[in-house]
Amino acid sequence: MQFLVLALASLAAAAPSIKLRAPSDVCPALDTPLCCQADVLGVLDLTCEAPSDDTSVSNFEAACATTGLTARCCTLPLLGEALLCTTP
């Protein structure tokens, strides 16, 4: 019971940090464009941040490259990490 309460409290605390974005033409469907540092088998991407320009695929990739990160389209971004990512 205590674990359940702790788990729900942590989810409630993390919810405001999830940033909802308007869909862009860079990534398909509900994927979110992110610039990520490390990719673990396409399942987990680490150290991700929102790109400064995601108006087109070339601008998205260039914006990520200027910071030394890789352009990725991720299904579930959460607290600087992301799940199920693909290349744009």
Curated annotation (Swiss-Prot):
It is found in: Secreted, Cell wall; Secreted. Residues 1-14 form the signal peptide. The keyword Signal applies. Pfam families: Hydrophobin_2. Belongs to the cerato-ulmin hydrophobin family. Aerial growth, conidiation, and dispersal of filamentous fungi in the environment rely upon a capability of their secreting small amphipathic proteins called hydrophobins (HPBs) with low sequence identity. Class I can self-assemble into an outermost layer of rodlet bundles on aerial cell surfaces, conferring cellular hydrophobicity that supports fungal growth, development and dispersal; whereas Class II form highly ordered films at water-air interfaces through intermolecular interactions but contribute nothing to the rodlet structure. This is Class II hydrophobin 5. It comes from Passalora fulva. The gene is hcf-5.
